[in-house]
Amino acid sequence: MTDGTCETPSTTPNFQTELAAQLADLVPEAIADGKVDVEKLKELLESDIVDSTERFGLFWPGKKRALRAAQEPTTATLRPDFENSKDWETTKNVFIEGDNLEVLKILQKHYHAKIKLIYIDPPYNTGKDFIYPDNYREGLQTYLEYTGQVDADGKAKSTSARNTLDNPHYHSAWLNMMYPRLKLARNLLKNDGVIFISIDDNEVANLRRVLDEVFGESNFIENYIWESNFRPDNSSRIERENAQHVLCYARNKSLLTGLVGAQKVTQGLPSLTKSSMKLSTLTFEPDWVEFQLPDGSYSAGERSSGYTLETDVTVLEGRATSSFSLTGRVIWSQQYLEQQVFDGTRIVIKGDGFVPYSRKLATSTLAPTTLLPRDQVGDVLAGNAEIRGLFGDPVFTHPKPTTLLRYLINSVTSDDPDAIVLDFFAGSASTAHAVLALNALDGGNRRFVVVQLPEPTPDDSIAASKGYKTIAELARKRIDLAGAAISQLDTGDGVDNGFRSYRLADTNFSEWRMSSDVEEDALQQHLLSLRDSATDDATADELLTEILLKQGYSLTEDVSAAEMGGLDLRLVRDRDGDVAVLAYLNEQTKPTLEQLRALVDEPPTRIIVLEDAFQGDDELKTNLAQLAKSKGVELWTA
């Protein structure tokens, strides 16, 4: 901060620097000349230090480099993709196309400790699946070349690779991909947040040990078993694999109130019948009653139990197809019956005597069982059926069913209907679909943030034949189709089925990224490019998105264009509708002090002005800073 002006950071947080600052606060005696004195720190922690020669843990080639990949700040940003968004102005859901390592770094500022649940279904390292680039130093540059945003000087480079079984670093390559992403993901979880990771036998042992290190062994919750195929292959006489793992860890297990797998029901089924009661009639809606009768039609008339069925009843899969009435010596009135049903009680009819019993749901719940209930979570064939139902063709292979994802999401968010759910290996977008479906079921307002690399669809795939060029494009379409289908449901009215779409991109602002041995001509050209703080082709919305992200705002802020004092502005409102930010992002036109005074008089919480908009007029900048300070307004430049 200089002269009351705050400067927007050019990169994401530097975790090494932040950790050192935290150590300085905790143990100032371990800081010498502004640096951490490791020997002094060891001396202070002597009784708690593990002998490194006998330490237990998971080690592999490249681990230190992978850790540095997580700690290295990035200048990357996200650019709004209005064309591929749905309900941009109102939605709170986010779809991001890009390399998830870079994206996770970008999300650190605002979404730190804000995510309730993370679910990921990463590559299983089977020797056939896609592996993210093992390139840490130039991750963003490689990504930009891969997606065609910059050229590679004629050299064809690809981010994708196959981690084949003959690779001598087969397991370490996969671990190097996962480790930095998990480190960054943990930062985003709320203190009572939970992560679920689907995996098969190829890497479950290694993944478990990595998660023990990243999250702590004490925060392990369960290794859930999902029966992924109800009809396994019969071709092998040695193995018939039909299950996968879902590893679950908490950020801080001691803060969890519990996970919800099922509601605990009271034992027994009290009858609604009492012989001393007068005859009365009750009417039952179809979803109030569970029949333990064979499917079929049951005629109206008096039953041997003493009850009279007033209307014909058709039972299908344990439910009546329409409402019906019973007359008998019941202890409940119609009003009391309706209140009990509203409170969660269900009626059970066990035989053709049509005697009604009550089943009350207790307030307590049961945690999920290790073996996930097949009748609630479905298998991969259910996932295939969902894709066919939306697209008409199997454009994704082996997608996770939304029933599985709904079960997992509900287990953590049943008491937090406004939770944010993150999936940074979005794939077929089952997680986003599941969030929308669960909101429709229980009236929740959960939001999703999903990230997917623009991995090309195989040339010989059905998806490619249908014109879908990337998995990211397919995923967006799946969310769109799922949202449209859910909006047609009786319970789908009011569900936020839109999403804001963003793409990973290089910064919109000039940056220093030249090597020390650069040729003189190239250096001069780069210095000339630094004269402007922003690139000429960046739009105001692109500039504002990057600035807001690096200042800690979300990807779903209420942003609009506005004119004030003759200046074209971008305006950001808070939840109450008040002006939080006014941004002037035109470096070509220098504003006058009177025009800037109009901004301060609004007054917003914060004013953002491009540095080059002052065009070197330090007096104008200083006067604006003094005006802002007098009104309690923060002045930021970029």
Regions flagged by a language model, labelled:
Residues 190-192, 201-262:
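Signature of N6-adenine DNA methyltransferases within the class I
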Residues 229-233, 242-245, 252-388:
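Active-site-adjacent helix-turn-beta-strand microarchitecture at beta-sheet edges
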Residues 114-194, 202, 218, 244, ...:
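SAM-dependent methyltransferase catalytic-core segment centered on the flexible catalytic loop
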Residues 1-119, 124-180, 610-614, 631, ...:
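DnaQ-like (DEDDh/DEDDy) 3′-5′ exonuclease domain used for proofreading
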Residues 114-131, 211, 421-435, 548:
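Conserved proline-anchored active-site loop of SAM-dependent methyltransferases
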